[in-house]
């Protein structure tokens, strides 16, 4: 590995000892030699740190947060200590496929300086890939990114980003939507969509609709509603006008999510007011009627509706 490697793989982790070992193994078996791995432990309370230290490889750097700050803050910490020209984000429960960094290196050598992000594909546990539908070969500016994101069923992709861009656009601290970063990035920089599958998403969480999991979900939704509302409001403030023109479906979803967050946060009067205004504009939005109906009954019924919807989608 050179003093300034080509890639820094940044892996945020919280209470995932088994999964982080799998993610690290997927990095260390890469044939491309010019990379480092920065693991950011977001104040885990189990053996996650010990799991990382069981890999005494000089390419791995372990950083630790004193307090749990969320995945975006952990990624920012990793980027701040990265030396690579390109940043590769990898979730702790996912893994790079064999040869992934070789593919990234080849693609990085082919792109002009005007391209600041390479978007690679994920392999999903349920089959198929994302993003879907395929947009391989397209170079997306701000408006192109909005139109693309508005039309896809699966929008997640593996990010390979020039480190220099983080001086202009950083991930939002706290627990607001990561989507803010992608929109802010798209307004400043261009993304090349690529056909190569470089990583696998693993679904390690059991999707069992137990009473305990439902109650945890409800508590989490209510506790995080104010922060989620902040994220939605930030997106609408920064990008609402462009979204309404280039991504009307996404814009409509954000308006409904704002209503949902208001109701879950206990701001019932404002939530119902915005809800009726939303339905006046979109009377055929069945999910809008469902949100308003459940929210009128209280925070718990609305959170339960979200729980059932999440299990149905899974």
Predicted ranges, named:
Residues 15-29:
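Short, well-formed alpha-helical segments that are part of the catalytic scaffolds
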Residues 21, 46-54, 95, 99:
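Acidic helix N-cap motif at the loop->helix transition within catalytic regions
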Residues 26, 41-50, 67, 91:
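A conserved acidic beta->alpha catalytic loop
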Residues 65-82:
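Glycine-rich, basic loop-to-helix element that forms the pyrophosphate-binding segment
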Residues 87:
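Short aromatic/hydrophobic "clamp" motif used to bind/position activated sugar donors
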Residues 99-132:
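Conserved donor NDP-sugar-binding/catalytic core segment of glycosyltransferases
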Residues 132-216:
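Conserved nucleotide-sugar donor-binding catalytic segment
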Residues 196-314:
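C-terminal subregions of glycosyltransferases and related glycan-biosynthesis enzymes
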């Amino acid at each position: 590995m050179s003093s300034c490697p080509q890639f820094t793989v940044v892996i945020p982790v919280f209470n995932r000892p088994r999964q982080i070992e799998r993610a690290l193994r997927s990095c260390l078996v890469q044939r491309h030699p010019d990379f480092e791995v920065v693991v950011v432990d977001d104040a885990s309370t189990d053996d996650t740190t010990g799991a990382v230290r069981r890999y005494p490889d000089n390419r791995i750097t372990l950083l630790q947060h004193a307090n749990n700050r969320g995945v975006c803050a952990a990624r920012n910490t990793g980027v701040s200590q990265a030396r690579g020209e390109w940043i590769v984000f990898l979730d702790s429960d996912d893994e790079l496929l064999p040869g992934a960094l070789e593919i990234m290196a080849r693609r990085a050598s082919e792109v002009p300086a005007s391209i600041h992000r390479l978007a690679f594909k994920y392999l999903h546990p349920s089959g198929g890939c994302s993003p879907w539908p395929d947009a391989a070969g397209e170079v997306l500016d701000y408006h192109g990114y909005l139109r693309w994101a508005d039309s896809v069923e699966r929008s997640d992709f593996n990010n390979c980003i020039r480190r220099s861009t983080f001086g202009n656009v950083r991930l939002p601290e706290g627990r607001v939507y990561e989507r803010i970063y992608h929109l802010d990035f798209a307004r400043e920089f261009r993304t090349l969509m690529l056909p190569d599958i470089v990583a696998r998403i693993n679904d390690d969480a059991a999707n069992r609709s137990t009473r305990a999991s439902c109650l945890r979900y409800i508590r989490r939704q209510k506790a995080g509603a104010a922060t989620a509302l902040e994220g939605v409001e930030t997106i609408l403030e920064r990008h609402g006008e462009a979204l309404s023109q280039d991504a009307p479906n996404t814009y409509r979803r954000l308006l409904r999510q704002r209503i949902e967050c208001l109701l879950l946060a206990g701001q019932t009067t404002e939530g119902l007011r915005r809800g009726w205004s939303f339905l006046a504009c979109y009377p055929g939005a069945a999910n809008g009627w469902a949100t308003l109906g459940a929210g009128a009954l209280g925070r718990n019924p609305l959170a339960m509706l979200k729980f059932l919807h999440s299990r149905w989608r899974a």
